[in-house]
Swiss-Prot record:
The active site is at D23 (proton acceptor), H51 (proton donor). Keywords: Cytoplasm, GTP-binding, Ligase, Magnesium, Metal-binding, Nucleotide-binding, Purine biosynthesis. Mg(2+) binds at D23, G50. Its cofactor is Mg(2+). This is Adenylosuccinate synthetase. It comes from Burkholderia thailandensis (strain ATCC 700388 / DSM 13276 / CCUG 48851 / CIP 106301 / E264). Its EC number is 6.3.4.4. The keyword Transmembrane helix does not apply. Pfam families: Adenylsucc_synt (PF00709). Plays an important role in the de novo pathway of purine nucleotide biosynthesis. Catalyzes the first committed step in the biosynthesis of AMP from IMP. GO terms for molecular function: adenylosuccinate synthase activity; GTP binding; magnesium ion binding. Homodimer. Its main location: cytoplasm.
Length: 448
């Protein structure tokens, strides 16, 4: 190694994670931060969550490829912690290339990334159908079953595609197992071996130019002085270990997963940016202490909840499912901050609260008559949480597009200040609209 290489100051690495149940607006913030990054990394999840970007008024939804792909010259990485559907990947690549973006020469996929195969999707959908009203609310895209195979040490990985004979042998073995479950337990149809083999091997040559030793590349890029941005998917409260289990996703969505899911040393993660909306949302089943619902009909949102959903366009970017809405839950936020080691917060969708007469903040709970200031760990206990609120005056002025703290309405500043106090970490960024320019910067994650 040359003396000049030794003297290069390593780049700075920032991890972006959701602190709620996903859908916090991470995509826009990752895109904004990419101005100061030379690489963006996905380290967990699959194509079950969409990151929505509004650039110059044009809407783009990315499900698998890192949001940095929207910036020419930025390298994008899919780490070993991701589960990859080649079909979804090439569909997304095609959409981006049709929009005039270069993708393949800037996208690097870990050879150790687990593949999603047709039988994973079949099992996912058959399970949900069997559960009926008790379903968790998966997207049916095979994410969970693919992670099950990974933990069960039977997963097929990207690198396996390049040895057709071994791939075929292992695929046949896997199908013997999964088809038994599909037909004998779930009552579904068997997945055809030859059709699956032909489809998957057909991706091999198309994937090969993008396959890389991602862990090594990230190490070398960082030590050459280049900044890296690690883009989390879903949110902390959906984490397989730390979320409201079993109403969770199948991967670790917390900041620590960036190290394992991309193959980087944890000491290289310099700053953790926690993304929180100015209110809360949740998709699918599971407890939600601060949910806004009609007291006379708990299965329906109340009028404020409906307003938040409509103004905030709270519909899943991948599934189109409506999101449940509620006030910001600071007790849940504190739990996420502790788990992730959050350095600073970015509050998104502040503008959605414009026009409300009052704004509430959940600062704790009553659980069976006892006070609690932190979200419990189990779903059953979370379901017994009765929210304790502080109430703030609303603001009638529009905050849309404001990009300085002092220009915010006084009541909006008071609300944000109180959130900082109860959270115990600073709010470093505030989003006041979907476009990248509609952002207030208080401390820059790459410059702290």
């Amino acid at each position: 190694m040359s003396a000049s290489a030794v003297n290069v100051t390593p780049g700075r690495n920032v991890v972006v994670v959701g602190t709620q149940w996903g859908d916090e607006g991470k995509g826009k913030i990752v895109d904004w931060l990419t101005d100061h990054a030379q690489g963006v990394v996905r380290f967990q999840g699959g194509h079950n969550a969409g990151h929505t970007l509004i650039i110059g008024g044009k809407k783009t939804i990315l499900r698998l490829i890192p949001s940095g792909i929207m910036r020419e010259g930025v390298a994008c990485y899919i780490g070993n912690g991701v589960v990859l559907s080649p079909e979804a990947l090439f569909k997304e690549i095609g959409e981006l290339e049709e929009a005039g973006l270069s993708v393949r020469e800037r996208l690097f996929i870990s050879e150790a990334t687990t593949l999603i195969l047709p039988y994973h999707i079949a099992i996912d959908q058959a399970r949900e159908a069997r559960k009926g009203a008790g379903k968790i609310g998966t997207t049916g895209r095979g994410i969970g079953p693919a992670y099950e195979d990974k933990v069960g040490r039977r997963a097929l990985r990207v690198q396996d595609l390049f040895d057709a004979r071994t791939f075929a042998d292992r695929l046949r073995e896997n199908l013997d197992f999964h088809n038994f479950v599909l037909t004998q337990y779930l009552g579904g149809a068997a997945v055809d071996f030859q059709a699956t083999l032909d489809t998957m091997l057909g991706y091999a040559d198309r994937l090969r130019p993008m396959v890389a030793d991602v862990s090594r590349r990230l190490y070398e890029e960082n030590h050459a002085g280049r900044n890296l941005l690690f883009e989390g998917a879903q949110g902390t409260l959906l984490d397989i270990d730390h979320g409201t289990y079993p109403f969770v996703t199948s991967s670790n969505c917390v900041a620590g997963a960036a190290a394992a899911g991309a193959g980087v040393g944890p000491q290289k993660l310099n700053y953790i940016l926690g993304i929180t909306k100015a209110y809360c949302t949740r998709v699918g089943s599971g407890p939600f202490p601060s949910e806004l619902y009609d007291a006379d009909n708990p299965s329906r949102q109340d009028q404020i909840g409906i307003t938040l959903a409509n103004v905030g366009k709270e519909f899943g970017s991948v599934t189109g499912r409506p999101r449940r809405t509620g006030w910001l839950d600071a007790a849940a936020l504190r739990r996420s901050i502790q788990i992730n080691g959050v350095s600073g917060l970015c509050m998104t969708k502040l503008d959605v609260l414009d026009g409300l007469d009052e704004v509430k903040l959940c600062v704790g709970y009553k659980i069976d008559g006892e006070d609690a200031d932190l979200l419990p760990r189990g779903a059953a206990e979370v379901a017994r949480c009765e929210p304790v609120y502080e109430t703030f005056g609303g603001w009638k002025e529009s905050t849309v597009g404001i990009n300085s703290w002092d220009a915010l309405p006084a009541n909006a500043r008071a609300y944000l200040t109180r959130v900082q106090e109860v959270a115990g970490v600073p709010i470093d960024m505030v989003s006041t609209g979907p476009d990248r320019d509609e952002t207030i910067l208080l401390r820059h994650p790459f410059k702290v």
